[in-house]
Amino acid sequence: MAKEKFDRSKPHVNIGTIGHVDHGKTTLTAAITNTLNTRYGTGAAVAFDKIDKAPEERERGITISTSHVEYETPNRHYAHVDCPGHADYVKNMITGAAQMDGAILVCSAADGPMPQTREHILLSRQVGVPYIVVFLNKCDMVDDEELLELVEMEVRDLLNEYEFPGDDTPIVRGSALQALNDPAGPWGDKIVELFEHIDTYIPEPTRAIDKSFLMPVEDVFSITGRGTVATGRVERGIIKVQDEVELVGLQEDSRKIVVTGVEMFRKLLDQAQAGDNVGLLLRGIQRTEIQRGQVLCKPGTIKPHTKFKAEVYVLKKEEGGRHTPFFDGYRPQFYFRTTDVTGATKLPDGMEMVMPGDNVTMEIDLIHPIAIEEGLRFAIREGGRTVGSGVVASIIE
């Protein structure tokens, strides 16, 4: 069967369901595909058990089960991720295996917010999920209007607690199961209403090409008579010949350099963009003054830092991680973009140790400054093998 051509005419948004176990995330995912297919004739209906049997994937050596479905509203194309287990969410969000432009928080009206409701909101805050829309599920089981209002208030308070705009967050009351059984009926209307909110409340993501230029340096060599060339894959933005860039990381001071040539597959170009593997010819810098692990970027857009807070997942023994816990002051290597830097870890107050399989918020102090920003992913390594995965939650200095 030939693959269908991906329709690029609609804006594309990545989304996912989050929330406590058994509050109806997977049922909602199935109901969405079914309802949008019934109402608009777009996409395909995906059955519950097909989503529930999520295939295992390995992302940076970590085993994660995730289901990917896609669907369309009249305005947009969505890629949606749903995870069967809580551990899969934690791993997924920390490794960035499934980047989310926004999330649908599913909360059962019958139970109200539960521990994982809170944990998923916190994780969303830490890993930089920018927008959350709430689906209050199982409303067919609750007759009491006051109870619904109470649950709604609790959810809003919880969102506020983790610095999401709880008071302005769209909350839709519905029943995923009823909508799945009768997508054309009144409960199906609730799914349509949910997506009217999502279409407007979750903005289109900025494409990598529209962001400020950044390229991690992978290799450096000098060409006699022409100068120094730095190679790497452009992470974001566009670079043109004669642009000024800044070299950031591994040294105290950043310095500005002019790009005098852009080369790709041995051909000279006027410009390169996000996703391209290129060599940049740099004027007035010696090969010894630039090294792997630094980044070239638009001047002033990123700074070198040594101290930051991170959300970390520690690999289990079965995933090739450590067999033993580690303690406060543990000093592994932190692998950012293209290089390892040693750093010391500081555990939260009152926490003695971290076991393989745990996720933890910790402070990290690197021995060299690195170009870091919130949302940047990294691996934790010991002697070249990955023992953990993390994401920068906030910069300290």
Curated annotation (Swiss-Prot):
UniProt entry tagged with the keyword Cell wall biogenesis/degradation: no
Database matches in NCBIfam families: EF-Tu, PRK00049.1, PRK12735.1, PRK12736.1, small_GTP
Listed GO MF terms: GTP binding; GTPase activity; translation elongation factor activity
Binding site for Mg(2+): T26
Top EC class for this record: hydrolase
Chain residue ranges for the region called G3: 82-85
This protein's name: Elongation factor Tu
Subunit structure: Monomer.
GO CC field: cytosol
This protein's record includes keyword DNA-binding: no
Record's subcellular location: Cytoplasm
Region G5: start-end pairs: 175-177
Gene: tuf1
Main location: cytoplasm
Organism: Alkaliphilus oremlandii (strain OhILAs)
Region (G2): 61-65
PANTHER family the record matches: ELONGATION FACTOR TU, MITOCHONDRIAL, ELONGATION FACTOR TU-RELATED
